[in-house]
Amino acid sequence: INGTLHKGRTNIAGEWGHHTLRPDGNECYCGKQGCVETYISGPALEKRWLELTGRIESLQAITKQTPNKQWKMEFLDNFGTGLANVIDILDPDVVVLGGGVSNVSFLYDEGWHAVCDKVFSDSVETPILKNKLGDSAGVFGACLLSN
């Protein structure tokens, strides 16, 4: 905020992956249920793919093909809901995706529309961009901001 890293009173600000997306949802390693991370992280998406198709595949392999319709619809719904909550609370200038999920190309068009369908405002202009530093961009950014 105002050019400084906001850590929050107890240093947990920004833990979007542990925001509750689905109450009584999937169990998370943090001990809670329904965390964003249990639905839209690479491992969670691969696990759901296995449940729907019976096939073990990487997120990269899944998205190189035409994904299972139910898998893709669930992914977009969860992505839209989760990110709309962040946008409604913070109203950021831009959202930059990091990690393996940032390599899912349809998130930058279909994902953006899924967010727009769920965000409070009728005029959403917050762009969703791919990071320029690879899967570990968030780690690099956090290091830079913490100095």
Q: Residue locations for each model-derived region?
A:
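A cytosolic small-molecule/anion-sensing beta-strand core signal
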Residues: 1-2
